[in-house]
């Protein structure tokens, strides 16, 4: 009887640990960087085109982004992911894209700027975009908001 009680306690503990692990945002959208590497120049695209999941919005963190800004601090995510974002902002080689569902960061991906440079977007106006936002990439692989882009 004691053996079964211990076993059931271990199962409950394992279920709790797995549920916490499952709540952590994961880099599940890594296929997006691969797709962006092959993105046709001057052809409109959205990140939704490359994702198997459905999110409400995306938040783009460019190099040297100030993670003390209110717009970032208001995002619901784990401390571990916030820490990762803080580290990533120190590199000018990457941008981090957060995928948001129901006001919570559910996934992220790290994009090398040589593949797609989101840092060329005017972030003084906006960091948060609808998931189906259309972008366009120029010859230098700089990404622009499609509706604001002119060749």
Q: Which residues does each PLM region occupy?
A:
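Short linear interaction motifs
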Residues: 77-88
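Short, surface-exposed beta-strand/loop "edge" segments at domain boundaries and coil↔beta transitions
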Residues: 67-68, 105-107, 144-145, 151
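N-terminal export/targeting and maturation segments
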Residues: 21-78
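A mature extracytoplasmic/lumenal domain signature
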Residues: 64, 101, 110-115, 122
């Amino acid at each position: 009887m004691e053996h079964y009680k211990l076993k059931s306690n271990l199962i409950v503990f394992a279920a709790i640990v797995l549920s916490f692990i499952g709540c952590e945002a994961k880099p599940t959208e890594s296929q997006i960087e691969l797709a962006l590497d092959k993105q046709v120049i001057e052809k409109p695209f959205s990140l939704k085109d490359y994702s198997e999941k459905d999110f409400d919005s995306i938040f783009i963190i460019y190099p040297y982004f100030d993670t003390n800004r209110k717009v970032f601090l208001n995002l619901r995510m784990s401390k571990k992911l916030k820490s990762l974002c803080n580290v990533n902002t120190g590199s000018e080689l990457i941008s981090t894209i957060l995928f948001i569902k129901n006001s919570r960061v559910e996934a992220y991906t790290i994009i090398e700027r040589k593949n797609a440079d989101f840092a060329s977007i005017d972030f003084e106006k906006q960091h948060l975009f609808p998931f189906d936002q259309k972008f366009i990439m120029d010859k230098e692989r700089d990404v622009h908001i499609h509706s604001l882009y002119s060749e």
